[in-house]
Curated annotation (Swiss-Prot):
The keyword Oxidoreductase does not apply. InterPro entries: PsdUridine_synth_cat_dom_sf, Pus10, Pus10-like, Pus10-like_C, Pus10_THUMP_arc, THUMP_dom. Responsible for synthesis of pseudouridine from uracil-54 and uracil-55 in the psi GC loop of transfer RNAs. It comes from Aeropyrum pernix (strain ATCC 700893 / DSM 11879 / JCM 9820 / NBRC 100138 / K1). It is an enzyme of class 5 (isomerase). NCBIfam families: pseudo_Pus10arc. This is tRNA pseudouridine synthase Pus10.
Length: 437
């Protein structure tokens, strides 16, 4: 036999029963526009024809080969074997690779997959496959027996065939660059589940009142504070998502307002069932949830890679604060000028504040105070300060000194106790770069 394709096919079929798809997959890179089922069917027919020719030309070994391989070749060999050697044909077992399940699993995966895509409002998807180890091992054994070098994996075939048939139903397309979901097909079990990618939105929030936390803070009696996350729950309801996560460019204290530029964030909705909601509608829902205490602006869709960029790029960016500071014994113009000269442009050495030591490691931070402008308030031992600082500088501790854990501090420079009694964030330097691609 002088055909490498037929030689490879015969080596495999002499040892293993193979369905048309699993045989044809050994030669998946030969020919164009054919399915593996068509390849396998064609190879089987030509192989039977070639062996039949050799028998007719007096090759007795060819008859033995044909009769021996016929159960593994299948129904296409029955009539020829029965004609050449009546009563010799024997039924073979199921396919050694897929167990005869491949066709039915592909068909059922398309049905269930399409239902899931529609249920989750998915237009762009990819297909993944979870393959039992025994199937992968059987496939490798057949490849070794055949010795063919033009095949593909059963995973690749399932991904392609399921994807192609789903696209043919309309309304969905395979998108490897930015899929909205992944359909996972189990083989040979046949189960299908969907991994829905989160919705991600660039947005900003403003906290217009104090005692509002950024994250939801549950207690047995209910939320400890109203939160930015809680205000966004109407967005979760609107999108039909399972959970909402706020990825903000830093955070302010619960008792601090966020004013001015607002704080940049990415809003993530996990496992949404409705994806194509206009930004204006999402923003309106969020602002309704904010109850006049928190305001939002939704800007554009975001990419997953930008979540990390928001956190990385904003960890030490500049921020501007307004602080109302009480000073023991009052404060004068001389005091505020002395503060400015001592602290403006200084690098502040700051150990983790004692108030957060229970949840953060005790480390030494070096953060710069870029500018400081304080004004005494008449009739009270108070001053109002506008500070521009490097991100990560704890302003309350910059004022109080935190028992010497922050140096220099307002209290150290003034030589008496100083306390920040109000704090507002009025500007956050931010334009996180777009993620690659």
């Amino acid at each position: 036999m002088d055909s490498r394709v037929l030689e490879s096919a015969l080596r495999a079929l002499s040892r293993y029963p193979l369905c048309d798809r699993c045989l044809g997959r050994l030669f998946a890179r030969l020919g164009r526009g054919w399915s593996n089922r068509e390849r396998g069917e064609a190879v089987k027919r030509v192989l039977v024809m070639e062996l039949h020719r050799r028998v007719l030309e007096g090759d007795e070994a060819a008859l033995k080969t044909l009769v021996s391989a016929a159960p593994n070749i299948g129904e296409v060999a029955r009539d020829v074997v029965e004609h050449l050697s009546p009563g010799s044909y024997r039924e073979g077992g199921p396919c050694a690779v897929c167990g005869g399940r491949l066709e039915s699993v592909i068909a059922s995966a398309v049905e269930e997959g399409y239902r899931l895509l529609r249920a989750y409002d998915i237009e762009r998807f990819v297909v993944g496959v979870r393959l039992e180890r025994g199937v992968a091992m059987a496939e490798e054994e057949v490849k070794l027996a055949a010795g063919a070098g033009y095949g593909e994996s059963i995973k690749a075939e399932i991904r392609r065939e399921v994807g192609k048939l789903l696209v043919s139903r309309g309304g969905v397309t395979v998108d490897f660059d930015s899929p909205e979901a992944t359909l996972m097909v189990e083989f040979p079990g046949g189960g299908v589940d969907i991994q829905v990618n989160s919705l991600l939105y660039k947005a900003r929030y403003w906290k217009l009142a104090r005692n509002i936390s950024q994250a939801y803070w549950p207690t047995p009696e209910g939320p400890r504070y109203f939160s930015v996350e809680q205000a966004l729950w109407p967005v979760l309801k609107l999108t039909g998502g399972e959970r909402l996560v706020v990825h903000a460019a830093g955070r302010e204290d619960v008792d601090a307002r966020m004013l001015g530029s607002g704080r940049p964030m990415i809003v993530e909705v996990k496992s949404p069932r409705r994806r194509r909601i206009p930004l204006e509608e999402l923003e309106a829902a969020a602002n309704a949830g904010g109850k006049g205490l928190v305001r939002f602006r939704f800007e554009t869709a975001a990419k997953r890679a930008e979540v990390a960029l928001y956190k990385e790029e904003t960890a030490r960016v500049r921020k501007v604060y307004r602080a109302l500071v009480a000073v023991e014994g009052g404060v004068s113009e001389v005091d505020v000028e002395g503060l400015r000269r001592a602290l403006e442009g200084a690098v502040i050495m700051q150990r983790t504040p004692s108030r957060v030591l229970h949840r953060r490691p005790d480390i030494l931070r070096r953060r710069r105070l870029y500018s400081l402008d304080c004004s005494p308030l008449e009739g009270a031992p108070l001053m109002e300060c506008i500070l521009e600082a490097e991100g990560g500088l704890y302003i309350k501790e910059l004022v109080s000194g935190d028992g010497g854990r922050t140096r220099p501090s307002f209290a150290e420079v003034l030589g008496r106790e100083a306390v920040c009694i109000e704090l507002d964030v009025v500007w956050v330097e931010h334009e996180a770069p777009a993620a690659p691609g």
